[in-house]
Amino acid sequence: MKIVGISDMHGIYEGFTIPKADILCICGDIVPLKYQNYIKSSDEWFINEFIPWCCKQPIEQVYLVGGNHDIFLMNRKYVIDQYLMGTKINYLDNSSCEYSDDTGKVYTIFGSPDCHKFGSWAFMYEPKTELEH
C-alpha cells in the first residue's frame, strides 16, 4: 500500500503533483490564509476549488484532518460531510474510517485535529494535568 501525506497547503496546491497512491492524508491547514477567519468564503473555496482538486488526484481515498488555521471545519462535521458526500474524501474529526486494500485487508484510519492551546486558533484545548487524568 502506498500512502502520501501532506499538510500546511494554505490553499496553494496548483502545480503541486501528487504521486499515484492508495491513500492521501491531508493533515491540516488547507484553507488559504486570506479566508481563515471567514466561514462563508472558506466554504465556497472548499466546495469550488479544494474538493474538485482532491477528486482529480490519482488516489483511491483521501483522508482530511483540520489544522489550527482551518476554523471553518470546527464543530461542523455534519456540514462538511454533506459537502463531501459522493466523493472519495473523508473528513476525520476525532473519528475514523475503514479502508480496504485490493487484497481485502482492512485498515482503520483515525484522525484528530486537536492540539494543545497555544493561541486563538482552531481545535485548541487546555491540556489536563497529570493529576486530572
Describe the residue ranges of each PLM region:
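Core catalytic region of metal-dependent phosphoesterases/phosphodiesterases
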Residues: 6, 11-101
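Binuclear metal-dependent hydrolase catalytic cores centered on His/Asp/Glu-rich metal-binding motifs
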Residues: 105-133
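Beta-strand-turn-beta hairpins that frame and shape the catalytic cleft
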Residues: 1-4, 96-111
